[in-house]
C-alpha cells in the first residue's frame, strides 16, 4: 500500500535530496554568502515585512535557487494577517 502511494505521489530519492543540498551549499560558497550573512539577510527581510504584515517569525525560510540562466532569492513566510496601515519605520 505504501509503495503504491509513493509511486502515485512520487518520492525524491535520497540522492536527489543530497544533490540539491550540495547545489545550495555550492551556490552560497560561490557567492561568498556566509551563514552569518544569510542570517542577517533573513532578519532584514523579517523586519521589513513585519511593518506590513503579522508573520510567524519562526517559519521564515530564505534560500537561493539557481536555474540555467539565473539565480533567485526565494523566501517562504507564513502570513498571519495583513495590517491596514504600515507600521512606522523605526530606523530613522
Swiss-Prot record:
The keyword Cell division applies. It comes from the Bacteria. One of its GO terms (biological process) is regulation of division septum assembly. Keywords: Cell cycle, Cell division. The keyword Cell division applies. Signal peptide: none annotated. Pfam families: MinE (PF03776). InterPro entries: MinE, MinE_sf. Prevents the cell division inhibition by proteins MinC and MinD at internal division sites while permitting inhibition at polar sites. This ensures cell division at the proper site by restricting the formation of a division septum at the midpoint of the long axis of the cell. Belongs to the MinE family. This is Cell division topological specificity factor. It comes from Syntrophobacter fumaroxidans (strain DSM 10017 / MPOB). The gene is minE.
Amino acid at each position: 500500500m505504501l509503495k503504491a502511494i509513493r509511486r502515485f505521489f512520487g518520492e525524491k530519492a535520497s540522492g536527489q535530496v543530497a544533490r540539491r543540498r550540495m547545489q545550495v551549499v555550492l551556490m552560497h560558497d560561490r557567492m561568498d554568502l556566509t551563514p552569518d550573512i544569510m542570517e542577517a539577510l533573513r532578519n532584514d527581510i523579517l523586519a521589513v515585512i513585519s511593518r506590513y504584515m503579522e508573520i510567524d517569525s519562526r517559519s521564515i525560510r530564505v534560500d537561493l535557487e539557481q536555474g540555467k540562466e539565473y539565480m533567485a532569492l526565494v523566501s517562504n513566510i507564513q502570513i498571519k494577517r495583513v495590517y491596514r496601515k504600515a507600521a512606522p519605520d523605526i530606523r530613522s
